[in-house]
Amino acid sequence: MQPIISFEQFNFQYKHAAQPTVKDITFHIYPGEKVLIAGRSGSGKSTLAHCMNGLIPFSYEGISTGNILIAGKDPRKKSVFELSKHVGTILQDQDAQFIGLTVEEDVAFYLENECVNQDEMKKIVSESLKKVGMHTFHKQSPHELSGGQKQTVSLAGLLTTNAPMLLFDEPLANLDPASSLHTIELIKNIHKQYNKTIVIIEHRIEEMLNLDLDKIILIDEGEIVAIDTPERILASNILPSIGLREPMYIEGLKRLHFDSNNDVIYPLENLHKESISGVIKEWMEKKAFCKDTPTKKELLKVENLSFSYPNKQKALENVNLSIYEGEIVALLGHNGAGKSTLAHSLIGINKTKNSRILIDGVNINSWSIRKRGEIISYVMQNPNHMITQSTVIEEVSFTLKLKKVSKEEIKFRAEEALKICGLYPFRNWPIQALSYGQKKRLTIASVLTANPKLIILDEPTAGQDYYHYKQFMSFIRKLAKKGISFIFITHDMNLALEYADRAIVLHEGRIIANHTASIVLGHPATLQRANLKESSLFKLVKFSGIANPGKFMELYFDDIRREEGV
């Protein structure tokens, strides 16, 4: 069988780059395969994707050497339009992909370019939307849809092209756990029904394993470091060495010093149940549960908070909660559960009645957004939505200039914030020279100049690979030790388990759980109601058959925190 995608000793160097971004790339993908190309940020995986769909060299100029064939043809000698008939692409930023004002108009875009007659076009659009379960949304605006629904509409648009290859660029970015699983099941169904070749660019290995991949291609610093089956990749210990995360249950097995005797450790069900049970019980006997719970001062208190948008049902109903100094709290729930509404109510965007929001015992209901912003800072998910200045130092100084603070004070506070955030060496850099992770830290530095007591972070680790995720969260923990409190709005269960002191779960505007993350995320009924999913570590513990899985989870993460000095 001839490969449908073929790279042989391929190199590519961007026009203004000093050296090649990808070097000596050789691999083959065959028709009908499901392949994951994984690597941390800047590894070169997106460059390979752009070579496949023609964005290189037609949108991104540079020099290439070696051989590349897509469906037997050299893509460098074809137009992007010609390549789109062979390779359909779904971008990470779904909003950037939409053309039409309605769902059906967007799905019809390719057919309009092909001058398909209207009757045939309507039939194909309807069939494509039915294939992905979105036919009832055909008159809606794409921008009214959730992240998962946008992904699904984009896929429907690709199905109208009959392209034999589908290329997904980080398809799970910004999706809640339920939407992620839906997207994966959708891709599996499309593959099963139409035998499409599936290529996925992603750094989250654990979630993508649900796709039943044929092989994984690992790339690091522009070079391929491994091509193998998921089973062999996970048994090789290579993922941590290139800054990628192993499934949490495999991390757990290593922490428990489990000896697999070279048995296959993936999938989880292949493990020997009695051996797992034995090693977990032995580990628990050695560990004493010693949770240090010093008395902390209450910083924020919310009493009877309710909020309704115009002409809609209540978005929040009778919410009561407290946040303590230096505490990190994960705010969890499905899309539409009320997480963002709660955050907007705390910072004053949403005006509430008959409720009390207290900071250090003072009711701030009458405070303006600006005054609240001096105590409670809100950091958006996408740093590009917050950054307005051209250099790092200008961005961090901007708020202080608006407050007419003296030049000496501005310089001192801005430089101090940059030092705390590890950005002082880059203070004179242009913003566009920063990485995504550095921009995230810059947004934190900007709010730190106001000396806030509470920082709300919307999806703090979205778009960051595991290496930068660890760096960023280590930085957040240091700030928490200084007494700053944090609320994370997140879909990342691993983040909540590892870093949050507490997890609060919202469902239909109400709090349905408020406890340590290990207890909350080990409660099946809560997970089901809130469209959250079990961690693979909890699945492993349940699989072992031990009497109290929740106790193990609490002990396990307590042990990690003590080791890290938390």
Swiss-Prot record:
Main subcellular location: membrane
Signal sequence, renumbered to the chain: none
Ranges of residues in domain ABC transporter: 5-246, 300-533
Pfam families per record: ABC_tran (PF00005), DUF3744 (PF12558)
InterPro entries assigned to the protein according to its UniProt record, in alphabetical order: AAA+_ATPase, ABC_Co_transporter, ABC_transporter-like_ATP-bd, ABC_transporter-like_CS, ABC_transpr_CbiO/EcfA_su, ECF_ABC_transporter_ATP-bd, P-loop_NTPase
Compartments, as annotated in UniProt: Cell membrane
TM region positions: none
EC numbers: 7.-.-.-
Top-level lineage group: Bacteria
Residues where ATP 1 binds: G39, R40, S41, G42, S43, G44, K45, S46
GO molecular function, one term: ATP hydrolysis activity
Group of enzyme by EC: translocase
Residues that hold ATP 2 according to the record: G333, H334, N335, G336, A337, G338, K339, S340
One GO CC annotation: ATP-binding cassette (ABC) transporter complex
UniProt keyword list: ATP-binding, Cell membrane, Membrane, Nucleotide-binding, Repeat, Translocase, Transport
Function field: Probably part of an ABC transporter complex. Responsible for energy coupling to the transport system.
Family to which this protein belongs: Belongs to the ABC transporter superfamily.
PANTHER family: ABC TRANSPORTER ATP-BINDING PROTEIN BC_2655-RELATED, HEAVY METAL TRANSPORTER
Protein name per the record: Putative ABC transporter ATP-binding protein BA_2641/GBAA_2641/BAS2461
Origin species: Bacillus anthracis
